[in-house]
């Protein structure tokens, strides 16, 4: 048994991790939040501890007071302010007497330095991993590919906010991603949470922990969508001109989306093991992704 603190537990991915923690009895946990969040605490029957992410010494004190062994960060990192909060959380954990393990807020693909340089939000997350490497803390980044939630909403419950990026389900259209033939990994946040919690019992962590809900090419995904809806979906191949896209996708198509297409093509989302990494599916064969191979049945 270890005591866990989930930072950002009221957000999308963090909420899914909290759900998984609530479903087990081996580990105790608290949720760290900038506010006391009484409604969230009552609804989920969890202990919420308010924390000031600008105060490293206070962070260390809170973690020690609650005898926290493992910190799981699920903070939303989209600005330097958010990134600084996570950096301070790392430093506070490193300065704590009780904390031994840390999970940075990654939950995506196996990004490298080139990705961090190309996409600001990826770079903002990467600094936490660099900071962790300087500490005595054992850490792992969870690599789960794309969130399958976006293909199953609203039929399958999710704590993620709905948004159009690659799909426009009502109009039966999809943005074209590269050649569409390269396999990519997709995992539902519910399953991410289950594997994250299972990993708490591992005697040793690798620096990267891979989770595979399903692996399909983008063409396969579009074909599945067409079979389910009974309509052929045209794939709208990205071009340098936003005028080539349907209206619903013009706002979605951006430099970020083009980068995703380039990264799809290079295999960034294929979740290929590298040195210092492990497939959690192999370590926990009893965990069968709820929305892996059967996700098409839940496509809305």
Swiss-Prot record:
| EC number per UniProt | 1.3.1.-
A Pfam family of this chain: NmrA
* InterPro entries according to UniProt: NAD(P)-bd_dom_sf (IPR036291), NmrA-like (IPR008030), NmrA/Isoflavone_reductase-like (IPR051609)
Q: Which gene encodes it?
A: BOA1
Instruction: Recount the UniProt induction comment for this entry.
Output: Expression of the botcinic acid clusters genes is coregulated by BCG1 during both in vitro and in planta growth.
Pathway terms, separated by semicolons: Polyketide biosynthesis
Functional description taken from the UniProt entry: Oxidoreductase; part of the gene cluster A that mediates the biosynthesis of botcinic acid and its botcinin derivatives, acetate-derived polyketides that contribute to virulence when combined with the sesquiterpene botrydial. Botcinic acid and its derivatives have been shown to induce chlorosis and necrosis during host plant infection, but also have antifungal activities. Two polyketide synthases, BOA6 and BOA9, are involved in the biosynthesis of botcinins.
One of the entry's Gene Ontology molecular-function terms is:
oxidoreductase activity
* Superkingdom of origin: Eukaryota
What protein is this chain from?
Oxidoreductase BOA1
Q: Which keywords has UniProt assigned to this entry?
A: NADP, Oxidoreductase, Virulence
Q: SUPFAM superfamilies from the xrefs?
A: NAD(P)-binding Rossmann-fold domains
Q: What organism is this sequence from?
A: Botryotinia fuckeliana (strain B05.10)
| Principal EC category | oxidoreductase
What family is this?
A: Belongs to the NmrA-type oxidoreductase family. Isoflavone reductase subfamily.
């Amino acid at each position: 048994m270890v005591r866990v603190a989930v930072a950002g537990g009221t957000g999308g991915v963090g909420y899914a991790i909290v759900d998984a923690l609530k479903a087990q009895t081996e580990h105790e946990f608290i949720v760290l939040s900038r506010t006391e969040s009484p409604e969230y605490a009552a609804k989920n029957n969890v202990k919420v501890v308010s924390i000031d992410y600008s105060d490293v010494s206070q962070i260390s004190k809170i973690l020690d007071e609650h005898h926290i062994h493992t910190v799981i960060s699920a903070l939303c990192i989209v600005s330097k302010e958010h990134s600084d909060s996570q950096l301070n959380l790392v430093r506070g954990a490193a300065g704590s007497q009780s904390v031994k393990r840390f999970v940075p807020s990654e939950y995506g693909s196996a990004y490298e330095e080139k990705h961090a340089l190309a996409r600001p939000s990826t770079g903002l997350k990467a600094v936490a991993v660099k900071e962790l490497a300087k500490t005595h803390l054992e850490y792992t980044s969870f690599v789960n590919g794309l969130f399958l939630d976006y293909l199953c909403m609203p039929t399958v419950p999710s704590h993620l906010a709905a948004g159009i990026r690659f799909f426009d389900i009502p109009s039966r259209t999809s943005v074209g991603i590269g050649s569409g033939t390269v396999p990519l990994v997709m995992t539902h946040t519910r399953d991410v949470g289950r594997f994250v919690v299972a990993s708490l019992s591992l005697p040793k962590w690798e620096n990267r922990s891979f989770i595979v809900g399903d692996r399909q090419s983008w063409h396969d995904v579009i074909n599945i969508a067409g079979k389910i809806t009974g309509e052929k979906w045209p794939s709208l191949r990205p071009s340098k001109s936003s005028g080539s896209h349907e209206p619903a996708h013009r706002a979605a198509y951006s430099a970020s989306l083009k980068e995703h297409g380039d990264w799809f093509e290079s295999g960034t989302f294929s979740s290929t093991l590298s040195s210092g990494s492990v497939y959690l599916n192999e370590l926990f064969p009893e965990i069968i992704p709820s929305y892996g191979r059967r996700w098409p049945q839940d496509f809305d």
